[in-house]
Swiss-Prot record:
GO terms for biological process: translation. Residues 1-11 have a biased composition (Basic residues). Transmembrane segments: none annotated. The keyword DNA damage does not apply. Belongs to the bacterial ribosomal protein bS20 family. Keywords: Ribonucleoprotein, Ribosomal protein, RNA-binding, rRNA-binding. This is Small ribosomal subunit protein bS20. One of its GO terms (cellular component) is cytosol. It comes from Geotalea daltonii (strain DSM 22248 / JCM 15807 / FRC-32) (Geobacter daltonii).
């Protein structure tokens, strides 16, 4: 356990950030899953709507530093490619 006041503060800050990042990552996974489920169901309209909803969430996670910007770009690219297979 930390003895210094500053170390105790950093522990609290880390816990807060971890919880916030966990929430963002969970939301991100949910939106990606919705796109994949729509594609699996071969529902083009639902897949496009799900993709349109997922892209801002992915970009938001990247801007908050939860995922790397390259990871976000790759995810958006792959999901878009997946949705375009239905058209």
């Amino acid at each position: 356990m930390a003895n210094h006041k500053s170390a105790l503060k950093r522990i609290k800050q880390t816990e807060k950030r971890t919880e916030r990042n966990r929430h963002v990552r969970s939301t991100l996974r949910t939106f990606i899953k919705r796109v994949r489920e729509a594609v699996a169901a071969k529902d083009a309209n639902l897949a496009k709507e799900a993709l349109a909803a997922a892209i801002p969430v992915i970009d938001g996670a990247a801007s908050k530093g939860v995922i790397h910007s390259s990871n976000a770009s790759r995810s958006v690219s792959r999901l878009t490619k997946l949705v375009n297979t239905l058209s």
